From Swiss-Prot:
Pathway: Cell wall biogenesis; peptidoglycan biosynthesis. It is found in: Cytoplasm. The gene is murB. The keyword Cell wall biogenesis/degradation applies. It comes from Clostridium perfringens (strain SM101 / Type A). This is UDP-N-acetylenolpyruvoylglucosamine reductase.
Length: 304
């Protein structure tokens, strides 16, 4: 296996056999369908397991990575050192009044569905974002003029000392694709959003409209991590890339989408290196043509 075999045995005291694996290919866990193995991957089923895992990692100085739905992640071909903590089994959603509370691993589409079923409007923007609520808080995810900062009420997080604390909207410091969670390395375990009462039919119509727009404009038929680049101030990344003649540009199995130039996709059989090489070429070309720096929105992690 790897250098963390002894640590794997320690973690095994907290997990059932099916909830802890070694050398798990990250290509099976992220939307891009690329990436080498995680030394250890755990899927906690309660908060206690999360806290115990974090405490052990910190006590033994073992690196860890928090994984939501894997929709905004690019894992390098060498995989991930240490422990990947995947939150997909922590996905409970509850509603009370105008508030929806979801565990970190709950999918945004399911939170959106819960809001719809309770005639709550304001979360339609997230219906097609393929991430989890924890990841959405982490990066202040958004689409179609909406973002988490518009609806978040509070979040429960685990801080750097493994203490659970409640953060208000203001304390979360949500900015463009950033948050205090990202800056300080906190772990989101639950989030509450506050919405407005609405009519089921109009909420459903908006969800359907946004879904149709997404399907018509984005290359959803290919593995990707969604929008590859952050929006540079005063520009649109996709237009800069298209105007640079890079639509369809490819290296190996990775390519700039023909459908939307802001997406780098896996056409089939891509390696993480292929994707990274395409990203680097796009950044270099746009810089040369327009003197604009493109920064990745997708998180790039792992070993070369």
């Amino acid at each position: 296996m790897n250098q963390y075999m002894e640590f794997y045995k320690l973690l095994g005291e907290f997990y059932n056999e099916e909830d802890i694996t070694v050398d798990s290919p990250m290509s099976e866990h992220i939307y891009f369908r690329v990436g080498g193995p995680a030394d250890i991957l755990v899927t906690p089923v309660n908060e206690e397991q999360v806290v115990n895992t974090l405490k052990l990692c910190r006590e033994y100085n073992v690196p860890y990575f928090i994984l939501g739905n894997g929709s905004n992640i690019l894992v390098k071909d060498g995989g991930i050192s240490g422990v990947v903590i995947k939150f997909n089994k922590l996905n409970k959603i509850t509603t009370e009044g105008n508030c929806v509370t979801a565990q970190s691993g709950a999918l945004l589409k399911d939170v959106s569905k819960a809001a719809l079923e309770n005639n709550l409007r304001g979360f339609e923007f997230a219906c097609g974002i393929p991430g989890s609520i924890g990841g959405a808080v982490f990066m202040n995810a958004g689409a179609y003029d909406g973002e988490m900062a518009h609806v978040i009420k509070s979040a429960r997080v685990i801080d750097e000392n493994c203490n659970i604390k409640n953060l208000t909207k203001e304390e979360l410091e949500l900015g463009y694709r950033s948050s205090i969670v990202m800056k300080k390395g906190y772990v989101v375990i639950e989030a509450t959003i506050e919405l407005e009462s609405g009519e089921y039919a109009s909420i459903k119509d908006k969800i359907d409209d946004l879904t149709n727009r997404r399907e018509s404009k984005q290359p959803l038929e290919y593995p990707s991590a969604g929008s590859t680049f952050k929006r540079p101030e005063g520009y649109f990344a996709g237009k800069l890339i298209q105007d640079s003649g890079l639509k369809g540009f490819s290296i190996g199995g990775a390519a700039v989408s023909e459908k939307h130039s802001g997406f780098v996709i896996n056409k089939g059989g891509a390696t993480a290196k292929d994707v990274l090489d395409v990203i680097a070429h796009v950044q270099k070309t746009v810089k040369e043509n327009f003197d604009v720096e493109l920064h990745t929105e997708v998180r790039i992690i792992g070993r070369d």
